[in-house]
Amino acid sequence: FLDEIYNNMFKEIFKLLKPQVNQIHNIRCWNNSAIAVMGFFFNDKEMLDFVFHGEYNIIRQIKEGVTKDGFWYEGSIHYNFFTLEGITPTLLFASIYNYDFDPEAKAIVRNMFVSAYNYAFTNLYLPNPNDGWPSINLKTYSYIYSVAAKVFSSDKEIVNILKIILNNKYPRT
């Protein structure tokens, strides 16, 4: 059954997504991540080589797409989290499958989570510069911080940020 799904669906999805990974962009992070998850699950070397060594690989996306202050280059809180939603599953699966994720890129992603927290107001609502949704708080992104806490489990700052978010009195927006 899994072989049929792999050969008839996931290999085809890879063929569809591969040419779309053609620039540094938040959606390309999602494309790379989808390919990475398939590659890890099915132990597909071609998929994993593409994700980690292709021209617009996930490491390059992170290193070139994230500013020095830990924010996605498109300049929107929404795009920053949208990008994190795309990148974080790759980090999680790399951890689960004992893949040596580039330490510098991993540190950049960690910094993205911390920076986003630092951008929030004291009530954990986020500013809305540029394109995005108004009146959003960090509780909206608690699920992605939960994954980050798993990926960075020994990092007390990330774990504490998650606790602060979950214990915030304001409802998820």
Where does each model-flagged region fall?
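Carbohydrate-active enzyme catalytic cores, enriched for enzymes
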Residues: 36, 78, 82-173
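Active-site lining segments of carbohydrate-active enzymes
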Residues: 1-78, 82, 88-89, 169-172
